[in-house]
């Protein structure tokens, strides 16, 4: 299955609670932090909630979906 690289590009200051929790669920903690997630409906739904705070691109290479952690 395809993977997505999700990078937080804007701050969570002043955003709604649901958006902040969606970022945490994706595993994003700070600006310029990236995670690789499996491309599925759940992930797409979380991205839709915070689309103005993140950048999404297809993951390239031998990347595998990872749970939080530092990249």
From Swiss-Prot:
Residue ranges that the Swiss-Prot or TrEMBL entry lists as coiled coil: none
Keyword line: Ribonucleoprotein, Ribosomal protein
GO annotation, cellular component aspect: cytosolic large ribosomal subunit
Transmembrane stretches, start-end: none
Keyword Translocase appears in the UniProt entry: no
Protein name: Large ribosomal subunit protein uL30
Family matches, as Gene3D superfamilies: Ribosomal protein L30, ferredoxin-like fold domain
Organism: Mycobacterium leprae (strain TN)
Quaternary data: Part of the 50S ribosomal subunit.
GO molecular function terms noted in the UniProt entry: structural constituent of ribosome
GO biological process assignments: translation
Family to which the UniProt record says this protein belongs: Belongs to the universal ribosomal protein uL30 family.
């Amino acid at each position: 299955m395809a993977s997505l690289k999700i990078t937080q590009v804007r701050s969570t200051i002043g955003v709604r609670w649901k958006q902040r929790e969606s970022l945490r669920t994706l595993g994003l903690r700070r600006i310029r932090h990236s995670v690789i997630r499996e491309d599925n409906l759940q992930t797409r739904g979380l991205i839709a909630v915070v689309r103005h705070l993140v950048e999404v691109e297809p993951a390239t290479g031998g990347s595998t979906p990872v749970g939080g952690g530092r990249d």
